[in-house]
Every structure is written in C-alpha cells, then in structure tokens.
C-alpha cells in the first residue's frame, strides 16, 4: 500500500511538473510594435537586396522581432519576414496589401497600423486603417475604421474583420451669440471621441475595449449631458461579428 501511495505521489509530482513546465514555456500572446530606426544601414541594405519592394518608398523601414527571433519589416503596404543568423538574413515570407491612394479632395487615406497582432502562436494579423476627416463651420471630425488581415503562410492575406470602429474625434460648435460665449466660459464646442484598445486573451480570442467620452458645452442646445462609457467585447476570430456591439452614438462614420 505504501509503495502504491508513493507511486501515486510520484505520478502527481510528475504531472504537476509537466503542467508547470507547460505554463512556463507557453508564452502569453502579445501585440508587437513595428518601430523605425532599429536597423543599421548595412542591415537595411542586405534586406533591401532581397525584397526590393520594401525600399522603393522613401519612408524608413519599420521592424520588430517576434519571440522566435524572426525579423519582420513593414514599409507602406509591404510586409516581410526574415530568419536571422550570424551570417545575415534569409527571406521566409512576404505579403503585399494594396492600399488606396490618398485622395486629397476626399481627405481620406489608408495605412497599415504599425503593430503585429497575434491570433495564436506564430500566426499573425495586421490592421489596415481607413481614415478620413470632415470640417464644417466651427467644427469637424476625424474618423478611423479598421479591417484586420491574417498573414497566411502562403503569402496571401485573409480579411476576417472589416470596417470596425477604431477611433474618432468630433467637435460641434455650441456658441452662436455673445451671451453663449459668456455663459460657456470659453468652452464653445460639444466634443466626443472613441478609442479602442485590443488585448489578446487566448488563441483566436481578442478583447476589444472601447472607450467613449462626450463633453458637452454649457452653451449647447443638444439636450445631451457629459458622459464617459466603456464596453469590453470578446471577439472570436473564427467568427467575428459583422460589427461590434456598441451603442449607435459611439459608432460615428461621418456626416456622409
């Protein structure tokens, strides 16, 4: 009986140590930042020789390293992944996302948000941001919407989230008379804004943390009251909803 108990205890210890080892080596999923100025001139030359598309633009390359020590580069709509060694760099994969040309009259543009989003270990996505602005007498707005693209091993991309609210800031004139200016004490606009913070929770599950703020001028005739709100949404990346479940007034898309 004693032998049996000792054997069972050993099994429990082995199981526990295996669990601890798994916990130690299962690195948490982290969003990684592309940054400029991390490559030497020599390194940049070596990389550009392998993927000339990266260096056709005059913008400085943005780079990062993932936990497996592969090097990732971002330049405009071009993304590339390289193995690193003492002898240099070897191209592993590359992707091209076609970005819309900036239209000055429409005040709109697209860019890749300089972060690498983990879907699961060694499986990543990027966000393409559509941005536009509008202006009107005494006010205006800037709006950003995000679409997320998986970077597949084949070199292709797959869009799995489309046109989600990402950020906006808007102000609307509230003072129209001398009395308004006096009563508002210099605060002559209604202002509201929305921000988004994304946190990976586990493989194929992200949490979208929306934060909304409304600041109403004392001179406003909108009937609104100043307000701050938040909503945390768990998004299953296998079947993301068409749009996030946030209040309609938080989802400003422009006056149209």
Residue ranges and their predicted role:
Residues 60-63, 81, 91-93, 160, ...:
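Residue-level detector of beta-propeller blades
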Residues 67-74, 119-132, 203-211:
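Acidic/hydrophobic-patterned starts of short beta strands in beta-sheet-rich repeat architectures
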Residues 56-67, 108-121, 195-203:
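Structural signature of eukaryotic scaffold interfaces centered on beta-propeller domains
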Residues 115-152:
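Contiguous hydrophobic, core-forming segments of folded domains
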Residues 26-54, 140-145, 151-256:
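Acidic, small-residue rich beta-repeat scaffolds with periodic aromatic anchors
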Residues 45-86:
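N-terminal "first-domain core" detector
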Residues 69-122, 134:
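Short N-terminal edge-element motif at the start of the domain
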Residues 1-12, 18-21:
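Bacterial N-terminal signal peptides that target proteins for export
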């Amino acid at each position: 009986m004693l032998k049996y108990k000792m054997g069972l205890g050993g099994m429990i210890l082995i199981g526990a140590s295996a669990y601890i080892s798994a916990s130690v080596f299962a690195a948490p999923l982290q969003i990684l930042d592309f940054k400029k100025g991390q490559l030497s001139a020599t390194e940049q030359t070596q990389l550009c020789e392998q993927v000339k598309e990266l260096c056709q633009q005059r913008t400085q390359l943005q780079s990062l390293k993932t936990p497996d020590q592969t090097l990732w580069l971002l330049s405009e709509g071009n993304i590339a992944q390289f193995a690193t060694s003492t002898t240099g760099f070897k191209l592993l994969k590359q992707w091209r996302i076609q970005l819309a040309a900036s239209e000055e009259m429409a005040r709109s543009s697209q860019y890749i948000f300089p972060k690498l989003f983990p879907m699961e270990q060694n499986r990543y996505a990027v966000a393409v941001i559509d941005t536009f602005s509008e202006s009107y007498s005494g006010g205006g707005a800037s709006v950003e919407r995000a679409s997320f693209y998986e970077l597949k091993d084949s070199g292709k991309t797959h869009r799995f989230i489309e046109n989600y609210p990402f950020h906006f800031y808007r102000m609307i004139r509230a003072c129209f008379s001398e009395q308004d200016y006096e009563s508002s004490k210099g605060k002559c606009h209604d202002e509201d804004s929305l921000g988004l913070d994304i946190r990976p929770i586990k493989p194929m599950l992200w949490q979208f943390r929306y934060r909304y703020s409304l600041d109403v001028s004392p001179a406003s005739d909108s009937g609104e009251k100043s307000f701050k709100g938040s909503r945390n949404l768990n998004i299953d990346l296998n079947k993301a909803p068409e749009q996030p479940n946030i209040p309609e007034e938080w989802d400003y898309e422009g006056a149209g």
